[in-house]
Regions:
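N-terminal [4Fe-4S]-dependent radical SAM core
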Residues: 1-16
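Canonical Radical SAM [4Fe-4S] cluster-binding loop centered on the CxxxCxxC motif
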Residues: 13-46
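Conserved non-cysteine loop/helix-boundary elements of the Radical SAM core domain that shape
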Residues: 34-218
């Protein structure tokens, strides 16, 4: 991070964040603004139309400036279909000068939203980093918090990304998930270590009012 920070253009640079507010399911601990993709499938095209229009407008407004970083988050960006992801990335690359970008991240957070076709689309563009986020490698916990995917899917998605040439893969974990103890976290770390991600981000569980757990008073 220090190496990247030293290269930032604090005068003319900026960071570009693009949000995709859809997920395969909404985790019970999550307070982010996101909705289940199945319930909003017929609205995704309308959202994408408005988003691409905004990206073009911001591109014109920022002429003379170059982004230092690009981050596509959410939600889960890979809930978009491959063709929709292609349009999104194409619009970004056409409307911004990316020659100064130090890091271009696409969150591929939910393994159950990752396909070979979507990863192949991402590889077409100057994306330098993806994030595949199991949060835990304990199946009992995944089921409890409503993530609706398996540990095996996490591993399959990770190794598929490696096979397609992704050489900067982050993984996110959450410490303190409901029902987990130190031995569960130790086992999760062991399994992740065996996969050799390029970076690991560990968050402490924080229940906020917007999360289902927060509304239930847990």
């Amino acid at each position: 991070e220090k190496k990247l920070l030293s290269k930032l253009d604090y005068k003319d640079g900026f960071s570009l964040y693009v949000g995709i507010p859809f997920c395969p399911s909404v985790c019970s601990y999550c307070s982010f603004s996101s909705s289940p993709i199945a319930e909003w499938k017929d609205k995704v095209e309308s959202y994408l139309f408005a988003l691409l229009k905004e990206i073009r407008a911001i591109g014109k407004m920022s002429e003379g400036h170059r982004p230092d970083s690009v981050y596509i988050g959410g939600g889960t960006p890979t809930t978009l279909e491959a063709e929709q992801m292609d349009r999104l990335l194409k619009t970004i690359t056409e409307n911004f000068d990316l020659s100064n970008v130090l890091e271009f991240t696409v969150e591929a957070g939910r393994p159950d939203s990752i396909t070979e076709e979507k990863l192949a689309v991402i590889r077409k563009y100057p994306v330098t980093r993806i994030s595949i986020n199991p949060q835990t490698m304990q199946q009992k916990t995944l089921d409890l918090v409503g993530r609706n995917h398996t540990v095996a899917q996490t591993k399959d998605a990770f190794y598929l990304a490696r096979k397609l040439g992704f050489d900067n893969i982050n993984m996110d974990l959450i410490a303190g998930l409901p029902g987990e103890d130190a031995s569960d976290m130790e086992d999760t770390l062991r399994q992740v270590e065996e996969m050799h991600p390029d970076s690991l981000t560990v968050h402490a569980l924080a229940i906020k009012r917007a999360a289902r757990y927060g509304q239930e008073g847990r």
